[in-house]
Amino acid sequence: MEERIRLSILLDIYGELLTEKQRNVLDLYYNQDLSLAEIAEHTSTSRQAVYDIIKRCHMLLVHYEDKLNLMEEKKNIEENKKGIIDFIDSLYSDKNAEVLDKIKNYIMNNI
């Protein structure tokens, strides 16, 4: 996975663990694709301060994922959910279609 996309996902997962300013800077950098100079102008800080925040938070987000593995867990859950849905699709017949649709909808919406 491209590092920029990975960091954007980590920001979504662990963003609440950062300060509001850190979240804002990272959102502008990773999700809005602004340059360091644009972020500095937008936040009324220096380009160097923006760079430092991004580097520090990058390390923090990677550290959180190394310890908690929430992104990996989410990926595994989605893969397992897809496997279950594929299995349910293989069981379809005219007699059980309604029940299987209810099971699929429950899995897709609640797990």
UniProtKB/Swiss-Prot annotation:
Pfam families found in the cross-reference section: UPF0122
InterPro entries linked to this entry: RNA_pol_sigma_r3/r4-like, UPF0122, UPF0122_fam_protein, WH-like_DNA-bd_sf
The protein's role, per its UniProt record: Might take part in the signal recognition particle (SRP) pathway. This is inferred from the conservation of its genetic proximity to ftsY/ffh. May be a regulatory protein.
NCBIfam families: PRK00118.2-2, YlxM
Family to which the UniProt record says this protein belongs: Belongs to the UPF0122 family.
Name of the protein in question: UPF0122 protein CKL_1400
Origin species: Clostridium kluyveri (strain ATCC 8527 / DSM 555 / NBRC 12016 / NCIMB 10680 / K1)
